């Protein structure tokens, strides 16, 4: 959703960057290709770009706890993040808790109006 700087204090912080291959027009669908995979060493950093230019995953492939520091810029005005399921070529929107509650309440009201009418 925004730019970010990712760093690690300990070994074991893996970063995988992806490129989106589809045009984003088909709702719920996203075809991603892995572009690079690397593991940061203590004190190393990397960055991510906003939106589709910065699709990435991070994790710890090892068995020892990794300590990381990730700093992200101000979110764009889109209002949601996108969560990608790489194996299934799927994408769905993730909303902040407050916004999601408002959306759920509006959906419930619409449902009640439809049931009463």
Show which residues each predicted segment covers.
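Short acidic-glycine-tyrosine-enriched beta hairpin
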Residues: 5, 19-55, 94-97
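A short hydrophobic beta-strand segment most commonly corresponding to one strand
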Residues: 5-7, 63-78
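Glycine- and acidic-residue-biased ligand/ion/polar-headgroup-sensing regions
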Residues: 1-21
């Amino acid at each position: 959703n925004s730019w970010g700087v990712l760093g690690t204090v300990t070994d074991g912080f893996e970063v995988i960057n992806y490129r989106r291959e589809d045009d984003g027009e088909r709702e719920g669908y996203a075809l991603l290709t892995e572009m690079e995979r690397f593991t940061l060493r203590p004190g190393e950093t990397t960055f991510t770009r906003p939106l589709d230019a910065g699709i990435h995953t991070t994790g710890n492939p090892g068995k020892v706890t990794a300590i990381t520091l990730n700093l992200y810029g101000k979110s764009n005005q889109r209002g949601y993040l996108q969560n990608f399921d790489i194996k299934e070529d799927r994408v769905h929107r993730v909303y902040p808790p407050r916004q999601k509650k408002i959306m759920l309440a509006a959906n419930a009201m619409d449902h009640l109006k439809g049931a009463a009418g």
